[in-house]
């Protein structure tokens, strides 16, 4: 089995790790950073920028720079969460044909899995550059509270990126794996994971290589992006109060505010006060306007108080579902960059009654855990058993629009559960199975995962036919449902891809497009390399012509000059093959010139080598009294 990489596909940043010699190693990207911004930009030239390159140009290209796409993955356009994002995003979020939330850039529509796949391709390339071999197998992490359609969409993103996703693993569980791999004692831990866009808390029991998740809870729309937005709103409100101009209407200014807000938030984790300076942020009839203000840690904490308060509920629910109290928890592990905020750490301490453990790197621990899980699946890591859970209950709609649960939340996965139902009317020929996920009593209040029909039921009074519905959740947390008429043995099943997901055909089309784009990238790189080599060849040839042109025939010199002119003309175009051909022709024409350069160099070397020897001989014969070699030798002898 080939190498398995572990990828933490984050809302704000992503990270990749691999097992090396039995130890997980976080891999630095081409820019030398161990995390990569989960950002994609589409330049005017058609070039696609990923990661740090995309982030650097975001201020000047806000409408075509995509970030926090993970918050849209597997979501319908009409949901409240998406509407919130539409109100604050500089890029365009549109409704797809299947009612999903997609994005539109430069007139082209993209699904969130497609955009996420571009980030995954960058992580794949980072790993391949480090390992020196092709990589196809991966373990990808998702927030523990992701529902089925979000998990399926993440798996689709992996497939589009050219990865074989061996396992989808929950982020807090991955962090627990990284924390507890070398721990020998039994303990109960809470993993508090507050990232760029999502919040999860999981309660686990660790012991003898077994990692058992007891419960999980969270909010898939609460994270650093929301804290950033609070800061942006505060800065914009203060500026409006001061200057009477609302910066929210200017996308470029808004992007600058976002960067400044994020920077201020990070600085206030270690400082009590920070300055925000944004010169030339906007202009009016009186001239340009500059934004200068101070932000204190206390002010930041007060404007984010509402978000901090939201962190407590999921923690209390997770403890209750696990049948534990806060005092039963031995360690609290902090995961995600947002846990560096002092107010977040204080909140964790208040909830669990103990100082959180800060022994793991919150930005890298999830990718490390994913790499360890990859090692487990590959057989490199022995004696580790991971027992994860499904975050939400699963069931079907029954008479009266009620949700009848077949699998309760926090059930260990993989798992399988069956229940027998019957018809609601006499002589009913078919039953419609409406599959749902959620905790509410009424079907309409829960998330629809899919619908399918079991037909061909023989005529019978209501309540007589026996329909067995079976739910099967695999180790990725992805649901398969089947319905069987026990009387006839007729069966119908679906693998849930969510009512608003990508079809198999769409995924395959996107895979082909991603491969085509990779081929385009390769062509662009080859063209740049050919141009660089050609530029260098022209420079060296012209330099040599200036110095040694008089050492070759006029006809040879003319051939070379014609070759240089032809190569310069080829450089005006964008055909790598033409440039290579013209470069080869110039190199052929330059052979005589190269010989002249070589001969001159050799001649200079020979003269340089013989000169001291000649002087020494002459000196020895004619200028004996002036030679100091003997004196020098005597001095050396004295020193000895």
From Swiss-Prot:
It comes from the Bacteria. One of its GO terms (molecular function) is ATP-dependent protein folding chaperone. Keywords: ATP-binding, Chaperone, Nucleotide-binding, Phosphoprotein, Stress response. Induction: By stress conditions e.g. heat shock. The modification Phosphothreonine is found at residue 198. Gene3D superfamilies: 1.20.1270.10, 3.30.420.40, Actin, Chain A, domain 4, Substrate Binding Domain Of DNAk, Chain A, domain 1. Residues 630-640 have a biased composition (Acidic residues). Residues 600-640 are annotated as: Disordered. HAMAP family: DnaK. Belongs to the heat shock protein 70 family. Acts as a chaperone. This is Chaperone protein DnaK.
């Amino acid at each position: 089995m080939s190498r398995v990489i572990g990828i933490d596909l984050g809302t704000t940043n992503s990270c990749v790790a691999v097992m090396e010699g039995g130890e997980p190693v976080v891999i630095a990207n081409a820019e030398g950073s161990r995390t990569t911004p989960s950002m994609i930009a589409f330049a005017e030239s058609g070039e696609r920028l990923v990661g740090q390159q995309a982030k650097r140009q975001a201020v000047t290209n806000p409408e075509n720079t995509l970030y926090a796409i993970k918050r849209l993955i597997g979501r319908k356009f009409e949901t409240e969460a998406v509407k919130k994002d539409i109100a604050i995003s500089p890029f365009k979020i549109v409704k797809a044909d299947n009612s999903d939330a997609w994005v539109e850039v430069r007139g082209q529509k993209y699904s969130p899995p497609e955009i996420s796949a571009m980030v995954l391709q960058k992580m794949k390339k980072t790993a391949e550059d480090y390992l020196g071999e092709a990589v196809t197998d991966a373990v990808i992490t998702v927030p523990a509270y992701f529902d089925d359609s979000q998990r399926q969409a993440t798996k689709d993103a992996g497939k589009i990126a050219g990865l074989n996703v061996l396992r989808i693993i929950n982020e807090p569980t991955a962090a627990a794996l990284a924390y507890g791999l070398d721990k020998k004692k039994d303990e109960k831990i809470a993993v508090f994971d507050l990232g760029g866009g999502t919040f999860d808390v999981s309660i686990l029991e660790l012991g003898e290589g077994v990692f058992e998740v007891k419960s999980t809870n969270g909010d898939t729309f609460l994270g650093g992006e929301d804290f950033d937005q609070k800061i942006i709103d505060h800065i914009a409100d203060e500026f409006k109060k001061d200057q009477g101009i609302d910066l929210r209407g200017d996308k470029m200014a808004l992007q600058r505010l976002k960067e400044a807000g994020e920077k201020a938030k990070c600085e206030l984790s270690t400082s009590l006060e920070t300055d925000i300076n944004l010169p030339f942020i906007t202009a009016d009839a009186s001239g340009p306007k500059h934004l200068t203000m101070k932000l204190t840690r206390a002010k930041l904490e007060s404007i984010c108080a509402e978000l901090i308060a939201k962190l407590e509920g999921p923690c209390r629910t997770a403890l209750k579902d696990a049948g534990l109290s806060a005092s039963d928890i031995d360690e609290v592990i902090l995961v995600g960059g947002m846990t560096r905020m002092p107010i977040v750490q204080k909140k964790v301490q208040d909830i669990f009654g103990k100082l959180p453990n800060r022994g793991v790197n919150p930005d890298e621990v999830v990718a490390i855990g994913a790499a360890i899980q990859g090692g487990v699946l590959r057989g490199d890591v022995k004696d580790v058993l991971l027992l994860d859970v499904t975050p939400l209950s699963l069931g079907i709609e029954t008479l009266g629009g009620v949700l009848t649960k077949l699998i309760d939340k926090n059930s260990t996965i993989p798992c399988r559960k069956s229940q027998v139902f019957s018809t609601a009317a006499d002589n009913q020929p078919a039953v419609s199975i409406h599959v749902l996920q959620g905790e509410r009593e009424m079907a309409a209040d829960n998330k629809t995962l899919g619908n399918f029909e079991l037909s061909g039921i023989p005529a019978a009074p209501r309540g007589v036919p026996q329909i067995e519905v079976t739910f099967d959740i695999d180790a990725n947390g992805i649901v398969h449902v089947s319905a069987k008429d026990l009387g006839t043995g007729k069966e119908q099943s679906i693998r849930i891809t969510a009512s608003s997901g990508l079809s198999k055909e769409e995924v395959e089309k996107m895979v082909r497009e991603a491969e085509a784009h990779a081929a385009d990238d390769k062509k662009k790189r080859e063209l740049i390399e050919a141009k660089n080599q050609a530029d260098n060849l022209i420079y060296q040839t012209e330099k040599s012509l200036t110095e040694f042109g008089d050492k070759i025939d006029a006809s040879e010199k003319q051939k070379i000059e014609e070759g240089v002119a032809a190569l310069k003309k080829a450089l005006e175009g964008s055909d790598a093959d033409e440039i290579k051909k013209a470069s080869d022709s110039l190199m052929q024409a330059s052979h005589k010139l190269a010989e002249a350069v070589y001969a001159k160099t050799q001649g200079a070397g020979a003269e340089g080598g013989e000169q001291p020897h000649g002087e020494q001989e002459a000196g020895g014969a004619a200028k004996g009294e002036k030679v100091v070699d003997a004196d020098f030798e005597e001095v050396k002898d004295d020193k000895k």
